[in-house]
């Protein structure tokens, strides 16, 4: 990047190291900001002992990572793979994916969703949540702006001021009691203002606690995870799990009888 030109030496050296341990690549995919010119492709092909047509440039995309499959198809990477494996495979229909990317790049309107959590400062802490919101937004021709709200800040301040005017509030899963009261206040703010609310795992639990306290008048209602002595345990462990000391790997996944 500093020299303003593509350097092929790192690729050649990486492939040489692979060949030293007996791995000969059939295809070399080069991550690059720009396309590879034919001279660089031929140089990589020659020094890596890979066919010229099997040198693929994986360029930076303009808008979203979801453009990558379409760019790779444009470079015929799918055909290279099936040809090298000797598989007779029909050309896939990517029209649904193309439509999704088009909606993602050219939204018709915008929405703001507040995500209230205690790991907001960590970029990837709620990565799957953020990506799910982006995908859901594209399905509805919407660009989703995410307002990251620290639940502990709500405890020390005012929910209406901190959360503000948003189109929806989402509280993701989590464990422990740190920041829990801020999440309960966020759920209350959503209920009293009519803002759409989605609670996932712990987010559903805090909505239950909030409703129990402020609508059902169950003072001190809580989950037994956060307050074992709560007078109103509206969320509790299953009877068969109450004796478990190590809570790791006890989360129920998938369908099961209840």
Locations of regions flagged by a protein language model:
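N-terminal beta1-alpha1 cap of cysteine-dependent amidohydrolase-like domains
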Residues: 1-258
């Amino acid at each position: 990047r500093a020299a303003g030109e593509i350097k092929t030496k790192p690729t050649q050296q990486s492939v040489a190291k692979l060949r030293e341990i007996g791995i000969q690549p059939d295809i070399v995919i080069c991550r690059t900001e720009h396309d590879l010119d034919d001279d660089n492709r031929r140089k990589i092909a020659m020094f890596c002992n890979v066919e010229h047509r099997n040198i693929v440039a994986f360029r930076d995309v303009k808008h979203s990572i979801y453009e990558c499959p379409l760019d790779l198809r444009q470079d015929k990477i799918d055909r290279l793979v099936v040809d090298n494996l000797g598989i007779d495979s029909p050309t896939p229909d990517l029209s649904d994916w193309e439509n999704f990317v088009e909606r993602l790049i050219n939204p018709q309107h915008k929405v703001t969703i507040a995500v209230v959590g205690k790991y907001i400062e960590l970029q990837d802490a709620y990565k799957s949540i953020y990506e799910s919101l982006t995908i859901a937004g594209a399905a509805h021709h919407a660009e989703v702006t995410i307002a990251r709200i620290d639940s502990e800040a709500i405890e020390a301040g005012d929910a209406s001021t901190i959360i503000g005017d948003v189109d929806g509030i989402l509280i993701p899963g989590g464990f422990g009691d740190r920041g829990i009261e801020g999440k309960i206040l966020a759920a209350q703010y959503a209920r009293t203002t009519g803002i759409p609310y989605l609670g996932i795992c712990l987010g559903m639990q805090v909505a239950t606690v909030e409703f129990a306290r402020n609508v059902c008048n169950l003072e001190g209602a809580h989950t037994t995870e956060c307050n074992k002595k709560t007078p109103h345990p509206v969320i509790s462990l299953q009877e068969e799990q109450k004796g478990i000391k190590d809570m790791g790997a006890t989360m129920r996944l998938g369908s099961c009888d209840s």
